[in-house]
Amino acid sequence: MAYVLTETSAGYALLKASDKKIYKSSSLIQDLNSSDKVLNQFKIAAFSKFSSAANALEEANSVIDGKVSSQLEKLLEECKTDKKATLVVSETKLANAINKLGLNFNVVSDAVTLDIYRAVKEYLPELLPGLNDQDLSKMSLGLAHSIGRHKLKFSADKVDVMIIQAIALLDDLDKELNTYAMRCKEWYGWHFPELAKIVTDSVAYARIILTMGIRVNAAETDMSEILPEEIEERVKTAAEVSMGTEITPVDLINIKCLAEQIVEFAAYREQLSNYLSSRMKAIAPNLTQLVGELVGARLIAHSGSLISLAKSPASTIQILGAEKALFRALKTKHDTPKYGLLYHASLVGQASGKNKGKIARVLAAKAAVSLRYDALAEDRDDSGDIGLESRAKVESRLSQLEGRDLRTTPKVVREHKKTEITEARAYNADADTVSSAAAPADSDDESEDEEETKEEKKSKKDKKDKKRKRDDDEESKESKKSKKEKKDKKEKKEKKEKKEKKDKKSKKEKK
């Protein structure tokens, strides 16, 4: 006797096969190509219906995990017989789990049984009475969605893609704002160059352009909403004595359009920064408490997702963002970097140069713990208590290394010097002519300078002459020496030749 266990979206179905060796015969499997043949081959022996959609999801997850649920075990116990029967199962893990139950079944699960399941699934509505095709497809679709949600553990508040896109857009906005602000200052600087030195903030600079227009309107313009009183006075004072050129109304219109873009971009950047902060507190509250919103968001964006970052060890988190320097150091066999993106965290910034690496290592270890709690904790907790505790431990370690209490350094506000208006200097015509009193003195100085230059030239000329004479003497000595050597060589050669001739003559005479 052979049974086929079929898991459907409506419940468990146990089908009895007319041929007990169907799983062994390939020809029988190929014959299951019509509904009549399938209905003749399989009859329903038992059916265990799922009570609800939640129950269906639970049972489906049990089958996927290879576990035998109590409902399935009850169904198999009801159908077991005295004789050992064959049970065809689709999942290998589930087959092993059923074997461990000790029921009187020979459980089979291999590649051949897949063809049986393909035929059974195709004609399932005909095999199960009381279930039509439309109802079964609706139940299957609902169960598939439930399984997908369960696997993904989907939550709208936990979507880290929003953080990745937000931090990337924030960086792009910063670049655009800097470019636009620089262009605006250069453009308007032709008309009012002193304004850029007085007002350093780009957004305030753009708002002044929109409010004031040309510098002539500075005295009548109210800038109290944009600037403090002292700086406003300095701007108005500088506008009265500005050295800038005049611009046409068309120029001003275009400059104002650029200033409007800067103000709008700055407002949107602030809105995006607030959005990123709220998203980070929702997705990774403990990491946010430990390293801050921007550093945390950059870590998540660099690794790709919160889960992949949570799976990374502390050593990887420590040097995340410094991969280029790491591989260069490994290639050249130099010291590896001590920190990457964590360098921008406030705790690392508070440490002195020699302790930055140690604090980065401690911070990375605590960040790894916080990340795993944020990403993998079953009970959601947005308080960030673990992050606060970890931060306190890192601060205590930093105090121990630095030997001082951690205190937030107050921001130093520079006092702006007031611009004082001085009377414009009149043109002095006497400055263009040489006064009679100063003329003799100037002429004496000039004559002295001329004498000094003459003496310097004479001394240089004498030195050159001496050097040339010395060189000539040396050359003459060398030439005399070389001539003498040549003469001696010639005489020696002549003597040698004469001697050889004499020897030859004497030899001939002897013969």
UniProtKB/Swiss-Prot annotation:
Compositionally biased spans, kind Acidic residues: 442-453
Protein transport is among the record's keywords: no
Extent of Basic and acidic residues compositional bias: 398-408
Chief place of localization: nucleus
InterPro entries given in the database record: Nop56/Nop58, NOP58/56_N, Nop_C, Nop_dom, Nop_dom_sf, NOSIC
Residue stretches in coiled coil: 442-511
Biological role: Required for pre-18S rRNA processing. May bind microtubules.
Family of the protein in this entry: Belongs to the NOP5/NOP56 family.
Name this protein carries in UniProt: Nucleolar protein 58
